[in-house]
Amino acid sequence: HPEIPPNTGNVIRLTANTATDLHLVEPLGFRMDDRELKRAGLDYHEYARVAVHRDFAACRAALDRPVPRRWFAFTTTGATSVYDVRFTPGDALVFGCETSGLPEDIVAQFAPAARVRIPMRPGVRSLNLGNAVAVAVYEAWRQNDLRGAS
């Protein structure tokens, strides 16, 4: 449920640069033709693969066809560091909205080992959503030999 158009625009640019897909779950805090969304994504929108799903169940059903994926929920309360996960191609990385993160009912669908956190200093609430996605995507890509990078 992204709320801030520039964050999603930045993630669109990230997905274009890493050949990853972006799946957004409604409700969105903006329209997909939002000026700030387009501005943040610059001219990368045409290179990004973006899908919008009505809810998390629909997203999960769409991505688990034809073969189920491994799913990881990114949360500040996760038990597993992003640097301890062994990512494989096709893994799904799930992030919450900017103001409140993933809802508890979504987090509860993930085994404790699949609840992932990005290490931060104590007493700091969270990273910016776009930055958190970048940290996770680049770590997963690095572990897979930056396949497709120049």
PLM feature spans:
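Post-transcriptional modification and biogenesis factors for structured RNAs
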Residues: 1-150
